[in-house]
Design a protein with these regions (language model features):
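An acidic/histidine-cluster motif and surrounding catalytic segment
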Residues: 1-100, 111-162
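Conserved SAM/SAH cofactor-binding pocket of Class I
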Residues: 104-105
Length: 162
């Protein structure tokens, strides 16, 4: 666990405990490293690995390599990078704590490490994310929020006066 950017209400110990719970819930085998950093660092990672020159809230990097210094058979499942800056903005906009937002982003990244891909799986990751965030007692997760933002807003019809 690396907290490069300190965030009020978020401790390494608390995040480590949540990562273990989320890893088990998502069925991820192996160790997961989580980096909480600033938007500039996440933008650099996004540009370097995905050719997207912009900051984003969370990135996941699956790995099948043995963890450094580990016993044979111990694998590094992958790494998750979270923008603390975007987490703070999201939490303020959505009315929940930054700690909850970082947990939501961690869960989303964990599901990517488990092999889910919301861009290609016809809603499978969205259903799993909703189920797990409810079990982990978290506010609405990323895919749910994106779905709500894309839903067409139906205007109520005006009644005609007779």
């Amino acid at each position: 666990m690396i907290l490069q950017k300190r965030v009020a209400g978020v401790s390494e110990r608390g995040l480590e405990r949540f990562v273990l719970r989320a890893r088990r819930a998502a069925g991820v085998q192996g160790r997961v490293n989580v980096l909480v950093t600033g938007s500039a660092a996440v933008r650099s990672l996004n540009r370097g690995f995905r050719s997207h020159d912009k900051a984003t809230d969370v990135l996941s990097f699956p790995s099948a390599l043995p963890a450094a210094g580990s016993h044979a058979g111990s694998l590094l499942a992958g790494e998750i990078a979270i923008s603390a800056d975007i987490a703070v903005q999201n939490a303020m906009r959505l009315g929940h704590s930054v700690a909850e937002e970082i947990k939501i982003l961690t869960l989303h990244g964990m599901l990517h490490l488990a092999g889910f891909d919301h861009e290609r799986d016809n809603g499978q990751m969205a259903r799993k994310e909703e189920k797990l965030r409810r079990a982990l007692r978290l506010p609405a997760a990323l895919i749910e929020r994106a779905g709500r933002a894309q839903e067409p807003r139906v205007q109520p019809r005006k009644r005609r006066m007779a």
